[in-house]
């Protein structure tokens, strides 16, 4: 039995540290090596922003060979015109891409983001891929007994095992393009805070700061790395993830890399002119620094005085010095605590009381404050107000009128189908205000805008827009404003006779504004009713829209099949509740094919023909057979339905929106048609009732 003394004299060796700090012997750059789960170390270097990237050095980094790769599968790339092998790198712990070079008989790492790794393509056998060379040779890539990469070549039927070669990784390719070029990741960064003397002092201070610091998080029980960033002047806290092989910021908010009063161990005090300078040992960066106490902020400020540190002057007393604030007439005692760190006490009613620690203003904190203030001043001085040319009131109005006229002309060219080079036909001569109002009313009737807010009309039955009420409102307002602008422009150009002008209120203009306001409120009510109709439809459908993302070709060939279950359910429900079951296509074998193909790839012509049939049923639900309809009337209905369907299709961005707008249009048309039928039925029932009463009265008289 082994004695206890032997066990204590030979303790178990401690595990190697996860992070090791050092310098690259070739480039003299600070690097940190990370111990990976495969017990191999990989070196990283920092950027000026505080990020860690793989260190590009052939001396520090381990040489990766093909035995570090476990092949998974290979896919063909059209861009590279070669097979791309997906393999797991046991050194970096990542899935990487490689192509085989027949000239050197080795693998070259590539990075093609468009080729994504798919675990479903994993080859289960030993042979992964067979590659044909330019000279007729065949190279077989397979897995060995350990699952690592091995390759064999055959020529004239004889197989031979190829030796293991080094990998040409992306890091080696970068070194080949620009060998030992460290300009991008150098530590020399031009910084400026507006004070050149302080910038030089801060640059010297930065040289003494450690680039990396290894800390232990007591809250998460993790070891993390503090990386210094010159651009921000702060430390970035990173932890290494073994599963992904990457660094990420630590999630603990309690662990910081800032210098606090607990990090300052006082050594001795020395007077310099009228101030007392404390020489301290900073445990955060392991440096000997100088600080003074600021009675205004109740904190310590780092300074650099012409005082040489002398370890022979270190004192062991508790009290260091006393400071007095003239404003509040308080005395502050700066002393060494029982743990040997800085401690502050202030005089109170019951004697001296311990003060709470505050932030320490190191050179880093001072530089950030000065830089922020300098950037604010620079931004305020460089801010230039935009200089606009001085315009008179007449010129401003004229520019507005011309802009309105140009906008109206563009819209008019689109409606007439003219190009920008073609001239617009001249308009009729200007009429009086009464005639202008009549023309406006006629135009509103042509646009099919409802005059009764309780019964919104649908313009689809006459080829209008069934869903663009707001667009009609904007178009009408632009037309009215344009006519007023043109009238003002013509009046400004015509010479007016000299006469005595007396002020009279423009009644016609006031009436126009009043009608415009009434029309706008009426349109708002119509929009509200449209929203209410859509809400009711959604409630009837159970607030479900089950629309397939794509239509198969076999289903699309059936014109009568509904395009969506939700649409078929809603349409059948409306037809069952409000209209009898009809089919106006009995005896009609034609189709409503469109003359031009649409640019919407998500719709097919069969679905569009089916929707035109839905609209025709909504336009004329009383007709049971097409043969009963007049030929011209039937053509007109088809034209209106095609026009309405085309407008809905152009206004839709996807199939769901197309079905929603189509269902809303069918609901509105059916509602309007049913109301007309009810009125006609009531009128027909009233006439025979009145005639029978008269016959009864005449019979009594006789």
UniProtKB/Swiss-Prot annotation:
Modification note: Degraded by autophagy.
Record field: compositional bias (Basic and acidic residues): 675-685
All residue ranges annotated as the KIX domain in the record: 597-674
GO cellular component: cytoplasm; nucleus
Motif (LIR 3): 298-301
GO BP of this protein: autophagy; regulation of DNA-templated transcription
Alphabetical list of SUPFAM superfamilies matching this protein: Kix domain of CBP (creb binding protein)
Motif (LIR 4): 469-472
Top-rank taxon: Eukaryota
Stretches of the chain forming a coiled coil according to its record: 508-543
GO molecular function terms attached to this record: protein-macromolecule adaptor activity; transcription coregulator activity
Bias (Polar residues): 458-468
Effect on the protein upon substituting residue 275 to K: In bp401; temperature sensitive with the mutant protein forming 'speckles' at 15 degrees Celsius and diffusely localized at 25 degrees Celsius
Compartment(s): Nucleus; Cytoplasm; Cytoplasmic granule
Disulfide cross-links: none
Motif LIR 1, residue numbers: 107-110
UniProt note: phenotype after gene disruption: RNAi-mediated knockdown results in the accumulation of cytoplasmic aggregates containing the P-granule component pgl-3. RNAi-mediated knockdown results in the disrupted formation of P-granules in an atg-18 autophagy mutant background.
Keyword Cytoplasm: yes
Domain statement: The LIR motifs (LC3-interacting region) are required for its interaction with lgg-1 and lgg-2.
The protein's name in its UniProt record: Protein sepa-1
Protein's organism: Caenorhabditis elegans
């Amino acid at each position: 039995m082994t004695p206890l003394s032997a066990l204590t004299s030979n303790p178990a060796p401690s595990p190697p540290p996860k992070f090791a700090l050092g310098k690259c012997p070739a480039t003299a750059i600070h690097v940190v090596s990370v111990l990976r789960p495969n017990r191999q170390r990989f070196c990283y270097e920092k950027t000026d922003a505080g990020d860690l990237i793989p260190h590009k050095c052939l001396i520090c980094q381990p040489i990766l060979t093909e035995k570090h790769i476990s092949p998974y599968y290979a896919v063909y790339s059209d861009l590279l015109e070669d097979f791309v092998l997906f393999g797991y790198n046991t050194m970096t712990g990542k899935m990487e891409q490689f192509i085989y070079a027949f000239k050197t008989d080795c693998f070259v790492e590539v990075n093609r983001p468009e080729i994504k790794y798919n675990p479903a393509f994993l080859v289960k056998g030993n042979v992964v891929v067979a590659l044909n060379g330019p000279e007729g040779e065949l190279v077989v890539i397979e897995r060995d007994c350990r699952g690592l990469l091995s390759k064999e070549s055959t020529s004239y039927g004889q197989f031979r095992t190829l030796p293991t070669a080094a990998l040409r990784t992306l890091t080696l390719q970068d070194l080949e393009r620009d060998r030992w070029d460290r300009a991008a990741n150098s530590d020399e960064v031009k910084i400026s805070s507006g004070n050149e003397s302080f910038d030089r002092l801060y640059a010297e201070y930065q040289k003494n700061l450690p680039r990396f610091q290894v800390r232990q998080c007591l809250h998460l029980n993790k070891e993390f790395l503090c990386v210094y960033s010159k651009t921000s002047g702060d430390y970035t806290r990173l932890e290494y993830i073994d599963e992904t092989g990457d660094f990420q910021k630590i999630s603990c908010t309690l662990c910081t890399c800032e210098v606090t009063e607990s990090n300052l161990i006082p050594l001795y005090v020395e007077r310099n002119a009228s101030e007392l300078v404390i020489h301290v040992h900073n445990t955060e960066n392991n440096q000997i620094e100088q600080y003074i106490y600021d009675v205004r902020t109740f904190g310590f400020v780092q300074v650099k005085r012409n005082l040489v540190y002398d370890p022979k002057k270190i004192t062991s007393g508790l009290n260091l010095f006393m400071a007095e604030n003239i404003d509040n007439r308080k005395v502050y005692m700066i002393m060494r605590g029982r743990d040997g760190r800085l401690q502050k006490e202030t005089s109170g009613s019951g004697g001296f009381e311990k003060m709470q620690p505050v932030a320490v203003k190191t050179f880093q904190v001072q530089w950030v404050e000065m830089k922020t203030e300098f950037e604010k001043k620079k931004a305020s001085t460089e801010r230039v107000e935009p200089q606009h040319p001085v315009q008179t009131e007449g010129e401003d109005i004229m520019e507005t009128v011309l802009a309105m006229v140009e906008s109206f002309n563009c819209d008019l060219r689109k409606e007439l189908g003219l190009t920008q080079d073609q001239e617009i036909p001249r308009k009729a001569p200007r009429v009086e205000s009464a005639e202008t109002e009549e023309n406006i009313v006629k135009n509103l009737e042509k646009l099919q805008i409802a005059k009764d807010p309780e019964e919104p009309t649908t313009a689809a039955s006459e080829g209008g827009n069934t869903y663009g009420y707001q667009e009609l409102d904007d178009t009408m307002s632009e037309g009215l404003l344009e006519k007023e602008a043109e009238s003002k422009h013509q009046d400004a150009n015509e010479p007016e006779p000299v006469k005595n002008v007396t002020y009279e209120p423009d009644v016609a203009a006031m009436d126009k504004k009043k009608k415009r306001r009434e029309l706008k409120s009426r349109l708002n009510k119509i929009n509200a009713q449209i929203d209410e109709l859509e809400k009711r439809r959604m409630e009837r459908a159970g607030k479900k829209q089950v629309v397939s993302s794509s239509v198969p070709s076999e289903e699309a060939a059936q014109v009568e099949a509904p395009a969506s279950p939700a649409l078929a359910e809603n349409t059948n429900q409306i037809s069952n509740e409000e209209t009898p079951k009809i089919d106006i296509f009995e005896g009609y074998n034609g189709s409503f094919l469109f003359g031009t193909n649409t640019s919407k790839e998500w719709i097919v012509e069969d679905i569009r023909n089916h929707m035109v049939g839905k609209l025709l049923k909504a336009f004329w639900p009383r007709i049971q057979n097409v043969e009963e309809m007049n030929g011209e009337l039937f053509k007109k209905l088809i034209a209106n339905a095609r026009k309405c369907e085309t407008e809905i299709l152009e206004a839709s961005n996807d199939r769901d929106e197309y079905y929603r707008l189509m269902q809303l249009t069918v609901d509105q048309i059916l509602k309007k048609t049913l109301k007309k039928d009810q009125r006609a039925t009531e009128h027909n029932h009233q006439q025979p009732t009145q005639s029978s009463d008269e016959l009864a009265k005449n019979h009594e008289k006789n």
